[in-house]
């Protein structure tokens, strides 16, 4: 649906050229929730804003439904933007307009009749749970309510694509969960393609189908969230995962020094997460196991579990083979 073909962005600064986004090639599929993660300055906002040409690409091509948007004239660009909604980090609401007025604003720009605007606004406010606040002004709302107004406004013109620019970074954890649940519902029930940027891997884990990792303007990793989250390849990705998992590597090293045997990390995905595989393999191979750390959680709707265990006695090699035969991913941390 959205294709970046050698798309890049350069800026001029103090007489020299700065690369914000190096030539990028990737495709975002229709109907998916696609996450873009990176540290500040990685190029994720630039990439997101190129999709509706709030940032003009310096070169390459950017296709939406097969149409190269880099060659659109003003009228074509206006039509394109009606198909793309956008939600902002700091809400960007009009302070002098009521909640209903903010949601109605993009519809007024299309020239829709008052009757159609009023009906659509009422529908959207009910959808995001703000029908009781139609005549309230933004200053009277909480952060989560403001973001729900922003979401309703972004949906006003019935877009096909929803761009989310750090939409949870200004929210508390409980409100973040509410907003992510609303976005998941939008994707599920309305079928919108959602492109979301964040610096929080936990947001990616909870809502996205696939993720791209950017580092200083370069795409360094891309794939299904289950693959990227559980088996990160690039150092930048690994650092995001470790921050999310709250892994203290120095503490782990101390734990490793206190135990004997082969140390492995086992990753279980799906229904395997709830099976007693560790005990079964221990009985079959005669190994003793010592659990050093572990967790069970979900990546979107998919359950997963990770255990770091020390294997000793019996036949550790046979134990690893048995885990592999059961479809469990094994990472050897110490032989």
Swiss-Prot record:
The keyword Mitochondrion does not apply. GO terms for molecular function: ABC-type D-methionine transporter activity; ATP binding; ATP hydrolysis activity. Its EC number is 7.4.2.11. It is a peripheral membrane protein. It comes from the Bacteria. GO terms for cellular component: plasma membrane. Residues 2-241 form the ABC transporter domain. It is found in: Cell inner membrane. It catalyses: L-methionine(out) + ATP + H2O = L-methionine(in) + ADP + phosphate + H(+); D-methionine(out) + ATP + H2O = D-methionine(in) + ADP + phosphate + H(+). The keyword Phosphoprotein does not apply. ATP binds at residues 38-45. Keywords: Amino-acid transport, ATP-binding, Cell inner membrane, Cell membrane, Membrane, Nucleotide-binding, Translocase, Transport. Pfam families: ABC_tran, NIL. InterPro entries: AAA+_ATPase, ABC_transporter-like_ATP-bd, ABC_transporter-like_CS, ACT-like_dom_sf, MetN_ABC, MetN_ABC_transporter-like, NIL_domain, P-loop_NTPase. SUPFAM superfamilies: ACT-like, P-loop containing nucleoside triphosphate hydrolases. Part of the ABC transporter complex MetNIQ involved in methionine import. Responsible for energy coupling to the transport system. The complex is composed of two ATP-binding proteins (MetN), two transmembrane proteins (MetI) and a solute-binding protein (MetQ). Belongs to the ABC transporter superfamily. Methionine importer (TC 3.A.1.24) family. This is Methionine import ATP-binding protein MetN.
């Amino acid at each position: 649906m959205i294709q970046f073909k050698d798309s890049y962005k350069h800026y001029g600064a103090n007489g020299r050229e700065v690369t914000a986004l190096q030539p990028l090639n990737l495709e975002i599929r229709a109907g998916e929730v696609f996450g873009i993660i990176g540290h500040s300055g990685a190029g994720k906002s630039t990439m997101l804003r190129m999709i509706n040409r709030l940032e003009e690409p310096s070169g390459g091509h950017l296709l939406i439904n097969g149409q190269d948007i880099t060659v659109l004239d003003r009228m074509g660009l206006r039509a394109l933007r009606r198909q793309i909604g956008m939600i902002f980090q700091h809400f960007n609401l009009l302070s002098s307009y009521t909640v209903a007025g903010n949601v109605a604003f993009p519809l007024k720009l299309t020239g829709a009749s008052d009757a159609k605007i009023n009906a659509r606004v009422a529908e959207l406010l009910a959808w995001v749970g703000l029908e009781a606040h139609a005549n309230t002004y933004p200053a009277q709302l909480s952060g989560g309510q403001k973001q729900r107004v922003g979401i309703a406004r972004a949906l006003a013109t019935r877009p096909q694509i929803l761009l989310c620019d750090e939409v949870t970074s200004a929210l508390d954890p409980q409100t973040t969960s509410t907003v992510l649940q609303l976005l998941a519902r939008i994707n599920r029930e309305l079928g919108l393609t959602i492109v979301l940027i964040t610096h929080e891997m936990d947001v990616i884990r909870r809502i996205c189908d696939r993720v791209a990792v950017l580092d200083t303007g370069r795409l360094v990793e891309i794939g299904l969230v289950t693959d990227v989250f559980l088996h990160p390849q690039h150092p930048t990705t690994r650092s995001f995962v470790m921050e999310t998992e709250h892994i203290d590597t120095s503490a782990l090293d101390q734990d490793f020094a206190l135990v004997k045997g082969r140390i492995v990390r086992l990753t279980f995905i799906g229904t395997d997460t709830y099976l007693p595989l560790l005990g079964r393999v221990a009985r079959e191979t005669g190994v003793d196991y010592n659990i050093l750390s572990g967790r069970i959680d979900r990546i979107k709707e998919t359950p997963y579990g990770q255990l770091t265990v020390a294997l000793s006695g019996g036949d550790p090699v046979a134990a690893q083979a048995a885990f592999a035969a059961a479809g469990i991913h094994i990472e050897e941390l110490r032989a």
